[in-house]
Amino acid sequence: MAFIKENELLPQRPIILVLYGPPGTGKTSMACTAENPLLIDTDRGFDRACQRVDTITANKWEDIYNAENLGNTETKGIISNYSTIITDTAKACLDDYLSAYVVQLNYKLATNSLKRFGEMADQFRAFVNILRAAGKDIIFICHDKETQDGDVIRHAPDCTGQSKDLLMRIADMVGYIYMNNGKRVLSFEPTDTRVGKNTAQLPTIEIPQYGSEDFKYFCKKIIEDVKKAIQSNGEAQQQALKAIEEANAELVQCETVEAANKLAEKAKKLAPVARKAFCLKMVKELKAKGITVNPETKKFEKLEKPTEKEEVTK
């Protein structure tokens, strides 16, 4: 168990990356440019990849299961020798191999799809958690599933309903590989027409040509960038929370127009998600202290008390 104090920098952790796209876009070749990869081939397509790496050709879930020696904690499995584990494809791994495996364990699950998917989810999570605990980055490759919605074609990873939901939940990043003006492009940003997940807020990236020096470690660099972004996001959130706490403390002590205007300038630097709520709170609490905002100058000033004549007029 790791204990992380609020003022400590978040440690880098292994990530889960999902890549999907049409045939021929080089999904497997790109994934194999990750650091020290092992490819678990469940789709019989490893020999088409431009970038050849060490490969397990799995025929059933037990091949993957036994490769890691999940049932034997004393002996390290083959997977332990690698930094990145690539599963190609996730659909065959989950919908075919793992589904058949849980039915083999309990034949009643063959006719009970709800419980079968529940058992599949438990087995899959256990496998993923062991890999993550061992510090392995994981890449799941999927085909592109196109669905027609009127004149619009929508794209999503090809995986059966609940298996896809499980994959999307555990993934840190989901990227779509496609051709754009003859060049291969990778985008993690979700749109109206395609599924994506962009935790690290990476821009759309042009994939380098195979054989170039940039392509050789392309996926390794992406994974490094994602890890750094997740780590820095945690640090940024910590700094944002600290800034809000300090602003609230100053608001409690704020009694003068000068202090109010200084606090207003600080409020402009708060994180956008918290800025509006704090400004509304500031206006309300300062008004109770006799300090209000001039609508013309947008500055705080002393709330003038009405004269006796004005009171009579009212």
Locations of regions flagged by a protein language model:
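Short, well-ordered beta-strand core segments
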Residues: 37-39, 138, 174-176
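Conserved GTP-binding G-domain of TRAFAC-class P-loop NTPases and closely related GTPase folds
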Residues: 147-246
